[in-house]
Amino acid sequence: MIRILTVSIILISGIFAEEISIGSKMPGADYFLKNIDGKESTLSEFKKENGLLVIFSCNTCPWVIRWQDRYNPISDLCQKNDIGFVSVNSNTRLHNSVDSFDEMIYHAAANDYKFPYTLDKNAKLAKAFGATKTPHVYLFNGVGELVYRGAIDDNAKNAKKVKRRYLADAINAVSRGMKVKTKTTKALGCSIKF
């Protein structure tokens, strides 16, 4: 019994890696991700002069649906500030159904995504980041160091009632070469389906 428990703990800890900490270098920068346009690219290729924003997302999570109307404005803010933006679908267990590549293409078109939406086969990138939720955001500066991780803002239900724009504030700080004041927040969302 103890042997089974030990093996189970080892297996589970291998699946759920520890989340990367502030100041960490971008993991998996050279993993290839398939974008909905059919091209395969790496995080290094998505990164721009002032950094990269990575959002772990999906097609059906109610939390993603609540926040996704903010994705395009965030993408625009990133573009304005010379920060790359990529959304990553790591729901491996659902890649043959509601989070299939074809469904991703449909979802992106239906929501007028203006940014890369990529497939993380086998959830390799999510595991490297220690990401566990959708949406789960990670902002890296121009030298590839993590400066913010967590939630988009403080109100998933109503964009008009947002009081704290954690991600937008972090993007603005990074683009000005300033320190991010709020470095971590709790990512609220559905679990990534490894």
Descriptions of predicted regions:
Residues 4-13:
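Sec-dependent N-terminal signal peptides
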Residues 105-141, 146-147:
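Short, internal strand/loop/helix patches
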Residues 49-52, 80-85, 112-116, 142-143:
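Loop/turn elements at helix/coil->beta-strand transitions in domains of secreted/extracellular proteins
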Residues 58-67, 137, 188-193:
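Short, thiol/selenol-centered motifs that function as redox-active sites or metal-ligating centers
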Residues 18-44:
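N-terminal "domain-start" segment that seeds a small globular fold
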Residues 44-65, 171:
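Short active-site neighborhood of thiol/selenol oxidoreductases, capturing the structured segment around
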Residues 139-194:
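Thiol-/selenol-based redox modules, centered on thioredoxin-like
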Residues 65-110, 121-128:
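Structural microenvironment flanking redox-active thiols in thiol-disulfide oxidoreductases
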